[in-house]
């Protein structure tokens, strides 16, 4: 087991904010559409779709919305043809940023994302400029208070194939897996009765850049927020590590 996940603090801080913005269902809907288009509409035979549906249900997305998104993906209903892309760039303090994009107009999206980067003190980079700094990993977060049950859950995760368990938080475990092992580990944890709050493949930085200046940290967070506010941005990953003490000083 390694040390604390450097991106976890930022993700946890922003989770409640994202829920309030009203864009969550739109983003998850696009995720379902793309997954169904690529692998078919049966979640039992399409692990990416299964994970997207689980994410939708965790966000309390109505079942009819989920089904419509699946049907748009399979072509049973008409809808926009979304294209997946990856954008790379740099934020304030030179931190690396990697964006998952789902767009029906790549020229519009590129122009708008470039403007957001520029306005936020960063710049949109060339393909390959920062992607090498990240690795795909299954990331699962579960609510497990300290105690005997916690140790049991850690052992279950490792036995099911987890590569790493971050247990520094007193209430939450963050578990990392190889992308192909995510579903098996998630199912093993569900069988143990714990509450899973997040489970999907993410781009995890190999190393991090500590931002211990509040002004720079604030600029990084504001840029992340503006990027996540864009409808075409499905996810934002960064190698920024903003310590909890600095995060507490930010008015974000």
UniProtKB/Swiss-Prot annotation:
Instruction: Extract the PANTHER family matched here.
Output: TRANSCRIPTIONAL REGULATORY PROTEIN YEBC-RELATED, TRANSLATIONAL ACTIVATOR OF CYTOCHROME C OXIDASE 1
Member of which family? Belongs to the TACO1 family.
Its GO CC terms are: cytosol
Q: Which GO terms describe its biological process?
A: regulation of DNA-templated transcription
Keyword ATP-binding in the entry? The reply is no
Q: Can you name this protein? A: Probable transcriptional regulatory protein Moth_1704
InterPro entries reported for this sequence: Integrase-like_N (IPR017856), TACO1_YebC-like_2nd/3rd_dom (IPR048300), TACO1_YebC_N (IPR049083), Transcrip_reg_TACO1-like (IPR002876), Transcrip_reg_TACO1-like_dom3 (IPR026564), YebC-like (IPR029072)
Disulphides: none
Keywords from UniProt, A to Z, are: Cytoplasm, DNA-binding, Transcription, Transcription regulation
Q: Where in the cell is it found?
A: Cytoplasm
Report which superkingdom the organism of origin falls in.
Bacteria
Task: Please report the organism this UniProt entry assigns to the protein.
Answer: Moorella thermoacetica (strain ATCC 39073 / JCM 9320)
Keyword Transcription carried by entry: yes
What broad class describes the main subcellular location of this protein? cytoplasm
Q: Give the organism's phylogenetic lineage.
A: Bacteria, Bacillati, Bacillota, Clostridia, Moorellales
Mention one GO molecular function: DNA binding
